Amino acid sequence: MFKKYLAELPDLETADEAVYTWNITNWKALEKKVHSETFQCGGHPWRILFFPYGNQSDHASFYLEHGYEEGQAPEGWASCVQFCLVLSNPNDTKIYMQQSAKHRFQADEGDWGFTRFIELRKLFSQPFTPEGRHLLEDNSATLTAFVRVVKDPTGVLWHNFVK
């Protein structure tokens, strides 16, 4: 299943991989900003940050975020991660939308993802399949995170050097 969503990185060594599934229920009653439960990958905590009605956009927004509490990440912490977030119909996983990225997470840059994951009108009012099925069904959806932590022997992999 991993290979379906994440391209191989032949020049990099994988440290760990994890799959986390979050069953999102009662979507329309959710707060503006929601976190999933925390899960582990590469010896570090991770979670999904979710804006059901968008993060300053007209799209549902999903991000992968380190799960350390404020100020609790180890000093100098960084983790290089390739990930794919897949939003699927809770009753039929063949109906889905996906977005992938790779990012160097750091204590002060703890989330990365997709402000424009999927348009809200496509979620709530437009059928997602020719048969008329919706991605959001029974006010629910499933979000699956495929997470691959890669080793960074150079200490600068995917570093943006802005700071």
PLM features: what roles do these ranges have?
Residues 1-163:
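Protein/peptide-recognition domains central to ubiquitin and immune signaling
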